[in-house]
């Protein structure tokens, strides 16, 4: 298998000021990895470089052997943002409708949902432990339930790599424990490569 994430002498600068300096590391298939650091330490920049949202000033960042900034095989990559988008919380969408978005092809918002993938939606909600919440309004969910909904959405494509940005921020202790149990299962049983971005080393080490 190709290495999911590789940084090779990667530098990145904002306004000529280096933020990421000569970074070299690889995340191998099936690995559970974490990018840790306090706010302002550059971990979000590293994540954006890994996902091709930023291009390194020099050096290379590779996703499955391809330059991250020109990577196109996005069904292999799942991304879980830190919080539910405000629009998803305001509009009367159900959990199932939000998870359905994971089946859209590419990142085209006009792409047609493929009905044949509806079974994947059910499987993803079950893996995230929210199958009993399918018809609930997003606005009625707790923070922890919303986070599991976003994870389910990212799992519909059956990704090889799952990147999570501060996944337990604002989640209570019970929700955090459920999250860690679920993520360990995804990594151990399905072999998904997991990358957690967090400022809290305790949350990662649990």
Regions found by a protein language model. Give the residues of each.
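Catalytic Walker B motif of ABC-type/P-loop ATPase nucleotide-binding domains
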Residues: 162-165
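Helix-to-loop junction immediately C-terminal to a conserved catalytic motif
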Residues: 51
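Conserved ABC transporter NBD signature motif
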Residues: 59-73
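H-loop/switch region of ABC-family ATPase nucleotide-binding domains
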Residues: 198-199
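Conserved catalytic motifs of ABC-family nucleotide-binding domains
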Residues: 158
């Amino acid at each position: 298998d190709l290495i999911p994430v590789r940084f090779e002498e990667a530098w990145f600068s904002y306004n000529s000021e280096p933020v990421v300096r000569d970074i070299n590391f690889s995340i191998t298939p099936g690995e559970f990895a974490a990018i840790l650091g306090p706010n302002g330490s550059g971990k979000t920049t590293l994540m954006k470089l890994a996902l091709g949202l930023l291009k390194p000033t020099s050096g290379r960042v590779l996703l499955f052997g391809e330059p991250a900034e020109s990577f196109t095989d996005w069904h292999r990559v799942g991304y879980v943002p830190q919080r539910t988008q405000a629009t998803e919380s305001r509009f009367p969408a159900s959990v199932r409708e939000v998870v359905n978005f994971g089946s859209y092809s590419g990142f085209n918002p006009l792409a047609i949902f493929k009905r044949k993938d509806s079974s994947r939606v059910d499987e993803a909600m079950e893996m995230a432990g929210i199958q009993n919440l399918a018809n609930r309004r997003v606005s009625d969910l707790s923070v922890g339930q919303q986070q599991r909904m976003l994870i389910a959405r990212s799992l519909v494509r059956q990704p090889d790599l799952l990147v999570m940005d501060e996944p337990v921020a604002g989640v209570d202790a019970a929700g955090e424990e459920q999250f860690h149990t679920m993520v360990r299962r995804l990594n151990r049983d399905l072999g998904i490569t997991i990358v957690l971005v967090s400022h809290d080393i305790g949350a990662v080490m649990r």
